Amino acid sequence: DAVTSGRLLLHELGHGEVAEFHHGDLWEPVLGRRFDVIVANLPHFPMGSNHVPGRLPSWSAGGPDGRYLLDPFLEGLERHLTPRGRAIITHNAFVSVERSREMVARSGLAVRVALTTLVYIPGDKLACMTDHVLEVEDGRSIHRYGPYAFGEMHIVEIGAPGTVG
């Protein structure tokens, strides 16, 4: 599973003693705790609950607008960061970064897009994307090169104003 794989990887890299992994219902396993760094790669691909052979049902499934898990994560983030703490998350460009920025601003946090890259979107995954999102974002944050499709993926840093960047 992801927790075991993550622990093994960090031990191999020499960081196993300073990292914690938690498994559970979003913020529930860490209620009342604050962290200097939170790293998350949430499923937030805009799609319904489609079955894709060889993939778990939760594979990338972020609900019709991609925000099913992203929004509750962002809403609870401020309660789990130390005053100078920050979160580093992946954020698909076709799932409004501006909406995320507005959400965390209500909690007194700031967002900075630290890096943008293109990520290959396999055809079976693209076929699962919510039609409306695909119509709006095709040619904007989803780019096609011949038979291949790529989506803009941001690495986003979130923290108190003055601590990000």
Predicted regions and their residues:
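Short amphipathic alpha-helical segments
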Residues: R7-L8, N50-P53, S100-E102
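Conserved Class I SAM-dependent methyltransferase catalytic core
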Residues: R67-L126
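Conserved Rossmann-like nucleotide-cofactor binding loop
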Residues: D1
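S-adenosyl-L-methionine
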Residues: T4-G32, D36-A40
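Short, hinge-like loop/turn segments at secondary-structure boundaries
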Residues: E12, I38-A40, L56, R106, ...
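Mobile active-site "lid"/loop adjacent to the S-adenosyl-L-methionine
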Residues: A40-P72
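Conserved Class I S-adenosyl-L-methionine
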Residues: T116-G165
